[in-house]
Amino acid sequence: MDHERMRRLHGGKSGGLERVGFDVALKSKAPVATDTWEFRFERPAGFVYKAGRHVRMTMLNPAYRDRGGETRFFSFASAPHDEDLVFVMRMRDTAFKRSLMALNTGEVVRIEMLVNAPHGAFALDENAIEPAVFLVGGIGVVPAYSMIRDTLERSTPRKLVLFYASRTPEDAPFLVELQDLAARNANLVFVPTMTGGDLPSWAGESGRSDANLIKRHIGNFMPATYYIAGLPDMVSAMRSVLKAEKVPAANVLAEEFGGFTMAHGHGKKRGSLLTIGIVLAVAAVVVAHLAAGAFVLRLGSFELSNPAMIAVGGVAAVLLLAKLVFFLRSGHRT
């Protein structure tokens, strides 16, 4: 999930798009793939959402804390007709994920959802009739699973095609469930492919999703809405494939997934700290010059024989030289 983009959409306490929040209690948690867990929460009365949408989840009383904060964004793995709210995620060694794992049944988290999806949101148009083609990798299958189940539940004639790349079958959440759905629904074409090399136990497609794989199963790129979800590199590669096949950009929706990283936030913090440091350094220079000036006035006329004046002059020269070096290294251009 692109956490920075989600933060911009949600904004702060008083900014961003309109949203609604609920406190939801944990019902159960269970592993569903390698390093991947399902968290099932009670669905509040009157809670309505669309398949493929996301929520902002906040730990109210986290057992662990770090600089990443107590908030993350997750797509629904459940479909709107399900009794519970379900989220599936890769587990990483972060304070948020450890706090989530530490939750006991009945303990609550807060989830917030945008009231109206922004333009271009990663969600299925329920009124569309053209085919929907999903190109997903890894945990990017989560919103696709929600949207596919919702579409099949509504018994629409819309054709659905899912290309699902995973390293191994053991790493692939919902693999068995999707195989079962495809076996029972003629409108769903499911093409899983494994990228983990030689897998004797796997008899299906292998290798990354690409134009050749797609064409083998659906022929030429059909007029459709294409949904891409996965790691940033995978999303970029699929965009390039669709562009090369002349698929209109307006027919492509994408959502980047990946482990939460504090690098972006840390970069901002480093930038802020650097700015603060520069300001403090300039302030120190100004104060030093003022002090030197006051010292000169107090001593009277400048005399090279005066050791105090030599010291003051030396300090001033060093400060001026430091300012000049900083000026040149900062890349200043007139």
What does each model-found stretch correspond to?
Residues 76, 141-155:
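Histidine-anchored nucleotide/phosphate-binding helix
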Residues 60, 114-118:
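Short, surface-exposed secondary-structure boundary micro-motifs
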Residues 117-128:
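A short, basic/flexible loop-to-alpha-helix module at the beginning of a structural domain
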Residues 131-135, 227:
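Conserved beta-strand elements of the Class I
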Residues 52, 140, 231:
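Short, conserved phosphate/pyrophosphate- and ester-handling motifs at nucleotide-, phospho-/glycolipid
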Residues 129, 153-160:
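Conserved S-adenosyl-L-methionine
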Residues 3, 11, 17-22, 159, ...:
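Reductase modules of NAD(P)H-dependent flavoproteins
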Residues 5-109, 166-168, 194-197:
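Ferredoxin-reductase
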